[in-house]
């Protein structure tokens, strides 16, 4: 038994080291790739100062943090709702952020600065989170709370569609493109959003013990002494914050929170002590590679990153559905 535990521990360490190396390689690729390939040796040149340090570096950092946040949100939700198909958009938080953003554009008549739009997106996400907490205080089961999140997401999606469809504002049409996900507008002015993600990411990565208990089911978690109501509310708020900040920075990006945790579990990383940092690293890798594809796929334009992740994630999602039905 001791030998098996040591082998498992070494295997987990190898996984995390490998993922860390891949994050480094994907980061280097993201900084080099673009309309002009800039090798690391040219990063200190005048061209590198502009393209690498002022344009690509803030974008790369944002992609890293958003990828980690979405994957961690998926891992938390899958443990919280005991459903391997749960993902961040399922609770309606992403759509709530979109409603907040569109409301800001309508009320501000397109005159609000970017930081104000970001705050409105976060506020929209947190409002949906507070509504979910209201449901949670009624001691609903996780399945009913999940259905409440789906219903809220549908309502928010309908509100966004109505607002965009009847609007003649160019800004709202641009927001429709933005809601497909993209990092094209990210620069150092959004650094406050990146900073807002970091403490929550670190805190979530340290919550392996309650998540391991929650993954066993509500009954087992109660028997082990976990204050279920407290932790469920706290984790819903943390998930809402991560998703809200991510949507404010990059729009709605799907499938990262669904696919990454499930793939890592299939690879044997079931303990949340390893799964959580693994999800953060793997989510960052996946979104970095998707962002590179979005930048390079077309010569004259940039693909929405949500299109890239959906194209790659939809077949995996169908496979997961078929696998869970067996």
Curated annotation (Swiss-Prot):
GO BP annotations, alphabetical order: cobalamin transport
Membrane topology: Multi-pass membrane protein
Alphabetized InterPro entries for the sequence: ABC_BtuC-like (IPR037294), ABC_transptr_BtuC (IPR023691), ABC_transptr_permease_BtuC (IPR000522)
Protein location: Cell inner membrane
CDD domains: TM_ABC_iron-siderophores_like (cd06550)
GO molecular function (one): transmembrane transporter activity
Pfam families hit by this protein: FecCD
Alphabetical UniProt keywords: Cell inner membrane, Cell membrane, Membrane, Transmembrane, Transmembrane helix, Transport
Residues spanning the membrane: 17-39, 59-81, 88-107, 111-133, 146-168, 188-205, 242-264, 274-296, 303-322
Main location per the UniProt record: membrane
One GO location term (cellular component): plasma membrane
Taxonomy, superkingdom: Bacteria
Family: Belongs to the binding-protein-dependent transport system permease family. FecCD subfamily.
NCBIfam families the record matches: PRK03784.1 (NF003001)
Described function: Part of the ABC transporter complex BtuCDF involved in vitamin B12 import. Involved in the translocation of the substrate across the membrane.
Subunit structure: The complex is composed of two ATP-binding proteins (BtuD), two transmembrane proteins (BtuC) and a solute-binding protein (BtuF).
Protein name: Vitamin B12 import system permease protein BtuC
Name of the gene this protein is made from: btuC
């Amino acid at each position: 038994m001791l030998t098996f535990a040591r082998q498992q521990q070494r295997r987990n360490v190898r996984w995390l080291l490998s993922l860390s190396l891949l994050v480094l390689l994907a980061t280097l690729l993201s900084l080099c790739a673009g309309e002009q390939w800039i090798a690391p040796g040219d990063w200190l040149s005048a061209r590198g100062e502009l393209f690498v340090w002022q344009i690509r570096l803030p974008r790369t950092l944002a992609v890293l943090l958003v990828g980690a946040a979405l994957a961690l949100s998926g891992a938390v939700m899958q443990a919280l709702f005991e459903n391997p198909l749960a993902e961040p958009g399922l609770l309606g938080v992403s759509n709530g952020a979109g409603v907040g953003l569109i409301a800001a554009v309508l009320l501000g008549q397109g005159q609000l600065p970017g930081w104000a739009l970001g705050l409105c997106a976060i506020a929209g996400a947190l409002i949906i989170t507070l509504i979910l907490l209201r449901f949670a205080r009624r001691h609903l089961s996780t399945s009913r709370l999940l259905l409440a999140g789906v219903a809220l997401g549908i309502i928010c999606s309908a509100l966004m569609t109505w607002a965009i469809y009847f609007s003649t504002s160019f800004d709202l049409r641009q927001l429709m493109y933005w809601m497909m996900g993209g990092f094209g507008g990210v620069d150092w002015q959004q650094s406050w959003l990146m900073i807002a993600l970091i403490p929550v990411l670190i805190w979530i990565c340290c919550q392996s013990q309650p998540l391991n208990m929650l993954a066993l089911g509500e009954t087992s978690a109660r028997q082990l002494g976990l204050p279920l109501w407290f932790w469920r509310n706290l984790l819903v708020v943390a998930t809402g914050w991560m998703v809200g900040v991510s949507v404010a920075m990059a729009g709605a990006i799907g499938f990262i929170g669904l696919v990454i945790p499930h793939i890592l579990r299939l690879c044997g990383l079931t303990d949340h002590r390893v799964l959580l940092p693994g999800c953060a690293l793997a989510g960052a890798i996946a979104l970095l590679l998707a962002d590179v594809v979005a930048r390079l796929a077309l010569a004259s334009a940039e693909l929405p990153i949500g299109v890239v992740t959906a194209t790659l994630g939809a077949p995996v999602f169908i496979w997961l559905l078929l696998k869970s039905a067996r």
